[in-house]
Amino acid sequence: MPRTEMVRFVRLPVVLLAMAACLASVALGSLHVEESLEMRFAAFKKKYGKVYKDAKEEAFRFRAFEENMEQAKIQAAANPYATFGVTPFSDMTREEFRARYRNGASYFAAAQKRLRKTVNVTTGRAPAAVDWREKGAVTPVKVQGQCGSCWAFSTIGNIEGQWQVAGNPLVSLSEQMLVSCDTIDSGCNGGLMDNAFNWIVNSNGGNVFTEASYPYVSGNGEQPQCQMNGHEIGAAITDHVDLPQDEDAIAAYLAENGPLAIAVDAESFMDYNGGILTSCTSKQLDHGVLLVGYNDNSNPPYWIIKNSWSNMWGEDGYIRIEKGTNQCLMNQAVSSAVVGGPTPPPPPPPPPSATFTQDFCEGKGCTKGCSHATFPTGECVQTTGVGSVIATCGASNLTQIIYPLSRSCSGPSVPITVPLDKCIPILIGSVEYHCSTNPPTKAARLVPHQ
């Protein structure tokens, strides 16, 4: 064989071997990436205690995890000052996450259409950095769970801070009070911070119960019936204010007055691990959070936000977003409760056994043809019509939440307040109410106040 032919014959296997080695390297690299993703999924399941009912569901959750890791890469590319990756929500589809944790869009959209009368704020004197956590005005991060109650956590977080800034001890207050009892909002199906402030002032005398006496139990998505009695009052508010849609004004008000309730577009929050968001999705408000501080000394400057997704998400439950560029639409719906000066908490409400008596009379002066019946407070009482009532005794008034279409205190309701120990004319006679500790009258029905 000629020498040149022999050289060609020798070179050919060498080339083939090199190509085979290259292909093997690519295959091994691909396998390594796949194994890495599977290892991350296994670590995710272990960290968050994830257990799936069968192999089909596990495969579905793995695909969701894979998609979320790809989304995390996209977010990281758009936000060079932040990191994204595995979070407690990494096995959820984007649609599931939106429905469970970002379900307030309709409430916030309606609120944006209303005419807001904002408070006047003097700008230009705010310090370069504020963090109300360092001043003892922020309770530990809480967990809303599988309930669309972010609005309640935002409202209560604001009141906790305002109460402390007014000179009172910091106390953890009850989100469950709002989720179960606020008749303006929709519990786990969404709500609005301004609505919650209004309900507290107009229907609950401005009082807010403590977390210890009325703990949060709606993390599983269930919404227990309202129970107004037997709870300790931990704080009280007199009003609320809306702030201008201006970040300088928001910073000035926060620096002087404490944490603020705000709404944001939380689409970019799902895969967030830490750092400062500078390219936050800003399409529509859908989530309520608490603004607790800012830092203008940083580059970029940032806001500090407390979330209600546990301390296993984000920066121990917090997120930072760039200040001055309306990231996540953060300046669109900012509000705060108003608290008076430092005062001791109001006295506790009557004990669970408290009752009230209705004197129903045929005449208009509460003197002729009268009958008397005693009913429990804080419990569902059926009326002589088709409705039902939950009543609460106050110092001088009786508050009734009337459910005109339900015999089980559910559905649409109307709150009213009537004076105690005073004759009140109604369409079919007159009534008078008295708070007492007498035992309830058996099988009695309340004559509805008309």
Swiss-Prot record:
Propeptide residue range(s): 21-125
Renumbered residue ranges of the record's region 108-residue extension: 343-450
EC number: 3.4.22.-
Annotated glycan sites: 120, 397
UniProt KW keywords: Disulfide bond, Glycoprotein, Hydrolase, Lysosome, Protease, Signal, Thiol protease, Virulence, Zymogen
Domain of life: Eukaryota
Effect annotated for changing residue 186 to F: In strain: Rhodesiense WRATAT 1.1
Outcome reported for the amino acid change (mutating residue 143 to D): In strain: Rhodesiense WRATAT 1.1
Disulphide bridges: 147-188
PANTHER family: CYSTEINE PROTEASE FAMILY C1-RELATED
Protein name stated in the entry: Cysteine proteinase
UniProt source species: Trypanosoma brucei brucei
